[in-house]
Amino acid sequence: MRIRVLGCSGAIAKDCRTTSFLIDDDTLIDAGTGVGDLTLDEMRRIDRVFLTHSHLDHVAALPLMVDSVGTARGKPLKIHALPETIQALRAHIFNDLIWPDFSRIPSESDPFIQFREIAIGQ
C-alpha cells in the first residue's frame, strides 16, 4: 500500500494544503485542497473517496475534481461517508445552487458520483 499525503493542514497558504490522502492510485481519504495538485490523469484514476466528515477543509476539492474528470471517467466516483456527511453534501454543495448535483448528472441511471453510506467501525 502506498500513501501519498496531499494535504494535512486546516488552512491554506503557500505550501499548505487541507486534508487529503491518496491511497495507492485509486482511493482518497478526504478531498481537501491538496487534491488540486494532482494531474487530471491522477484524478481520473480515483475510484472512491472516503470522507471523515463534512468540514470544508476535508471536502473543498471534491466538487471541482468531479467537474474536472466526470465525463472522462466512464463510471461513477463512489463517495463513502456517514449518512450525516452525505446529507450535508447534498444540502450544501451538490444542490444545484452551489454546485450541480452530480448524483443525477448526466442522468440518474448513469451519474458522475454515487453516495455510499458507511457506519462508524465499518
Task: Place the predicted regions along the sequence by residue.
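Binuclear metal-dependent hydrolase catalytic cores
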Residues: M1-Q122
